[in-house]
């Protein structure tokens, strides 16, 4: 190669918005391995709604398996099932959503107490991967998606975008 070429920046296309209901966190204790890796926290998912290009309900039974390495950061690994409605009624989408949430220690404490925190004060970004039950939704498995989220006292709001 002789010269570096700058490629066009990817664009984002909004796909859907989720309102996910959760119940109280389960503290699973300190993680051990190659030194202390932080704490494990499990957040049960109790339901929710999906609006946008795909529509449906977040079914109860999923969970967010969090690794909390310090007072400011949580590595999230949420897995849950969406029952689709509208054009795809009867079909399902399985979501595996990896995320990073970072805030000041004070804002993290407020979130843990169930107090509201301005979403602009919290870095909450995700990269969902989907499994689908119908060929008409295969585009969900053939593209890269990113998202932004906000934690509320009883749930999470997430917007998913497809990289173009």
Predicted features by range, described:
Residues 1-164:
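Beta-strand-enriched cores of mature, soluble protein domains
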């Amino acid at each position: 190669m002789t010269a570096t070429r700058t490629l066009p920046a990817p664009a984002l296309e909004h796909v859907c918005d989720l309102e996910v209901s959760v119940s109280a966190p389960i503290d699973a204790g300190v993680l051990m391995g190659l030194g202390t890796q932080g704490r494990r926290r499990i957040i049960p998912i109790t339901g929710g709604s999906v609006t946008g290009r795909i529509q449906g309900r977040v079914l109860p039974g999923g969970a967010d398996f969090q690794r909390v390495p310090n007072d400011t950061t949580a590595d999230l690994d949420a897995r849950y099932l969406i029952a689709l409605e509208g054009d795809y009624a009867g079909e399902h989408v399985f979501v595996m959503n990896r995320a990073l949430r970072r805030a000041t220690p004070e804002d993290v404490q407020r979130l843990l107490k169930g107090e509201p925190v301005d979403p602009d004060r919290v870095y909450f970004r995700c990269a969902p991967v989907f499994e689908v039950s119908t060929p008409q939704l295969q585009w969900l498995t053939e593209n890269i998606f990113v998202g932004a989220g906000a934690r509320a006292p009883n749930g999470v709001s997430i917007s998913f975008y497809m990289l173009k």
